[in-house]
Amino acid sequence: MSSTFDKVADIIAETSEIDRDTITPESHTIDDLGIDSLDFLDIVFAIDKAFGIKIPLEQWTQEVNEGKVPTEEYFVLKNLCAKIDELVAAKKG
């Protein structure tokens, strides 16, 4: 996961105005980093492009809004990176 985390953290720092040094695996993209929905969409688009995947953001948001999963499941970086790794592995299938 560490290379995935580094890549994602770099994308977040480049896409937003967040200092790369403040981004950790425990960071919650919204609560800790203060990323707004527009910036998050830009970040997801950049992640999709960098990893050659399609993050199912609409599905994830719906699951969170319906209370099926806690926001931490998708929006804490270590968990987001694990999901990215799963999507990459599934694509390689």
Curated annotation (Swiss-Prot):
Described purpose of this protein according to its UniProt entry: Carrier of the growing fatty acid chain in fatty acid biosynthesis. Is involved in the transfer of long hydroxylated fatty acids to lipid A.
An example Gene Ontology biological process: lipid A biosynthetic process
Localisation: Cytoplasm
GO MF annotation terms: acyl binding; acyl carrier activity
Known pathway: Glycolipid biosynthesis; KDO(2)-lipid A biosynthesis
Domain Carrier positions: 2-88
InterPro entries: ACP, ACP-like_sf, PP-bd_ACP, Ppantetheine_attach_site
Key words of the record: Cytoplasm, Fatty acid biosynthesis, Fatty acid metabolism, Lipid A biosynthesis, Lipid biosynthesis, Lipid metabolism, Phosphopantetheine, Phosphoprotein
Positions of modified residues (O-(pantetheine 4'-phosphoryl)serine): S37
UniProt keyword Cytoplasm, yes or no: yes
Post-translational modification: 4'-phosphopantetheine is transferred from CoA to a specific serine of apo-ACP by AcpS. This modification is essential for activity because fatty acids are bound in thioester linkage to the sulfhydryl of the prosthetic group.
Gene3D superfamilies in the record: ACP-like
GO cellular component: a single term: cytosol
Pfam families hit by this protein: PP-binding (PF00550)
Name of the protein: Acyl carrier protein AcpXL
Organism: Brucella melitensis biotype 1 (strain ATCC 23456 / CCUG 17765 / NCTC 10094 / 16M)
Keyword Lipid metabolism among record annotations: yes
